[in-house]
C-alpha cells in the first residue's frame, strides 16, 4: 500500500520519481481495495482501466523517458535534456497524481473529516459545505483535462484550492502540498457518467478517504 502521509518537496518527489543520478525503475502501485469496491459511485470497469491501463502507461513512459534522460546526461546533450522535460513532467506528474488519488479514495469513505482538518477547513473556507462547493466548482471548471486539488500552503499555514491542467503535479507547479486530488480527465468518469462531469463530482464525495487526507494534513504540519 502506498504511503499515506507525504509532505515536503523532497519527500514528495523522491519516493515516486527517484533520483535520476541513482536510477531505479518505477512500478505501478497496488490499489488498497478491489476494482469494484467503490461501486456504485465509480464502477469497476473505470477503475480497472484507469489503474491497469492509464496509470500503468504513465509509469512505463516515465521509465522510458528517464532512461533517455540518463543517456542525454551522460553525453552532456543539453538539447536532448531540455526536449525531454515535457515528457518527464507529464508522465512523472501522472504517476505522482494517481499515486495520491488512489489513497484519497476508500469504499468506507464519504461524510466529513474530523478533528484538526475539519477545523482548518472551517477556518479557511467558512464551512465544510462551502469547501465542497468551491472544490467541486474548481474541478468542474477545468477546461479539458486536469485535476482539482485541496493543498496546504506551508508558508501561510493555510489550506488552498487549486486546479492544474493535464498531469501537472500540484507541488511541482504551485508549491502547494497535495492533500486531496480529484481527477477530472474523461477516463476517470466517462464510461459511467458520459460527458456530465458534475454528476461524477457529486458521486466522488461518497468515497473520499478523509482518514488519508487527514494523515497528509497532519504530516505537513510537523
UniProtKB/Swiss-Prot annotation:
Modification type 3'-nitrotyrosine: residues: 58
Give the superkingdom in one word: Eukaryota
Query: According to its record, what are the GO cellular component terms?
Result: extracellular exosome; mitochondrial matrix; mitochondrial nucleoid; mitochondrion
Where N6-succinyllysine occurs, the residues are 68, 75, 122, 130
**Subcellular location per the Swiss-Prot or TrEMBL entry:** Mitochondrion matrix
Pfam families given in the database record: Sod_Fe_C (PF02777), Sod_Fe_N (PF00081)
Residues binding Mn(2+), per UniProt: 50, 98, 183, 187
Q: What is its main location?
A: mitochondrion
GO terms of molecular function: DNA binding; enzyme binding; identical protein binding; manganese ion binding; oxygen binding; superoxide dismutase activity
Outline where the chain's transit peptide begins and ends. Answer: 1-24
Task: Give the induction note.
Answer: Expression is regulated by KRIT1.
Q: What is its EC number?
A: 1.15.1.1
Q: Which reaction does it catalyse?
A: 2 superoxide + 2 H(+) = H2O2 + O2
- Involvement in disorder: Microvascular complications of diabetes 6: Pathological conditions that develop in numerous tissues and organs as a consequence of diabetes mellitus. They include diabetic retinopathy, diabetic nephropathy leading to end-stage renal disease, and diabetic neuropathy. Diabetic retinopathy remains the major cause of new-onset blindness among diabetic adults. It is characterized by vascular permeability and increased tissue ischemia and angiogenesis.
Q: Which family does it belong to?
A: Belongs to the iron/manganese superoxide dismutase family.
Name the record gives this protein: Superoxide dismutase [Mn], mitochondrial
Taxonomic lineage from the root: Eukaryota, Metazoa, Chordata, Craniata, Vertebrata
Amino acid at each position: 500500500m502506498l504511503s499515506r502521509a507525504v509532505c515536503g518537496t523532497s519527500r514528495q518527489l523522491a519516493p515516486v520519481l527517484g533520483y535520476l543520478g541513482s536510477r531505479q525503475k518505477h512500478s505501478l502501485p497496488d490499489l488498497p481495495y478491489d476494482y469494484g469496491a467503490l461501486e456504485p459511485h465509480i464502477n469497476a470497469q473505470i477503475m480497472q482501466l484507469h489503474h491497469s491501463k492509464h496509470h500503468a502507461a504513465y509509469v512505463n513512459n516515465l521509465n522510458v523517458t528517464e532512461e533517455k534522460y540518463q543517456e542525454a546526461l551522460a553525453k552532456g546533450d543539453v538539447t536532448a535534456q531540455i526536449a525531454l522535460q515535457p515528457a518527464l513532467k507529464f508522465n512523472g506528474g501522472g504517476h505522482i497524481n494517481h499515486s495520491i488519488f488512489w489513497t484519497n479514495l476508500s469504499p468506507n469513505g464519504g461524510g466529513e473529516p474530523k478533528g484538526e482538518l475539519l477545523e482548518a477547513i472551517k477556518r479557511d473556507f467558512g464551512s465544510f459545505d462551502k469547501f465542497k462547493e468551491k472544490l467541486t466548482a474548481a474541478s468542474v471548471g477545468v477546461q479539458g483535462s486536469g485535476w482539482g486539488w485541496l493543498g496546504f500552503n506551508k508558508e501561510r499555514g493555510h489550506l488552498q484550492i487549486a486546479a492544474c491542467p493535464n498531469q501537472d503535479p500540484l507541488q511541482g507547479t504551485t508549491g502547494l502540498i497535495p492533500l486531496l486530488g480529484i481527477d477530472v480527465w474523461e477516463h476517470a468518469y466517462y464510461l459511467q457518467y458520459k460527458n456530465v462531469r458534475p454528476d461524477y463530482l457529486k458521486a466522488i464525495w461518497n468515497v473520499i478517504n478523509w482518514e488519508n487526507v487527514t494523515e497528509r494534513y497532519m504530516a505537513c504540519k510537523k
